[in-house]
Regions:
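PAS/PAS-like sensory domain cap-loop motif
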Residues: 36-47
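PAS-family sensory/regulatory domains
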Residues: 48-59
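PAS-family sensory domains
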Residues: 23, 83-89, 93, 102-105, 108-123
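Sensory-domain boundary capping and coupling elements
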Residues: 96-98, 118
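Beta-strand residues that line the small-molecule/cofactor-binding core
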Residues: 77, 91-95, 113
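PAS/Per-ARNT-Sim sensory domains
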Residues: 58-73
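Sensory modules in modular signal-transduction proteins
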Residues: 2-26, 31-34
Length: 123
């Protein structure tokens, strides 16, 4: 995803964690902001190109992840809560929203990326 300088400035200034992934079955992280780094303890250079599943663990709710996958396959926005894990292994409860980003308009629009906005509920 090619980010304009204005869009990047907004994401970089956000208090919430922002992660952008590729679509089309690759599901690779292409961007994270500083709030993501602070929340998770992972540096951007260490997560770019990875599938975000590495943030999940034993207490991550499988039903929530199934709903996420279902909504994204239908090109719908997902919103939910789950437990993810920081780089040091500590869990955190987060509320997050994942939005499909489409190229084009109408029936021919294709999902190119997903934008995940994450907010910690409990440390």
């Amino acid at each position: 995803m090619e980010m304009t300088s204005g869009l990047k400035a907004i994401a970089d200034a956000s208090f919430d964690s922002v992660m952008i992934t590729s679509a089309g079955g690759k599901n690779q992280i292409v961007y994270v902001n500083k709030a993501f780094e602070k929340l998770t303890g992972y540096k951007a250079k260490d997560v770019l190109g990875k599938d975000p599943k590495f943030l999940q663990g034993a207490a991550t709710d499988p039903a929530t992840i199934r709903q996420l996958v279902k909504d994204l396959k239908a090109a719908k926005t997902f919103e939910g809560r789950t437990i993810n894990y920081r780089a040091d292994g500590s869990p955190f409860i987060m509320h997050w929203r994942v939005l499909p980003v489409k190229s084009g308009r109408g029936a021919s629009a294709k999902v190119e990326n997903y934008v995940a906005i994450q907010r910690v509920i409990s440390a």
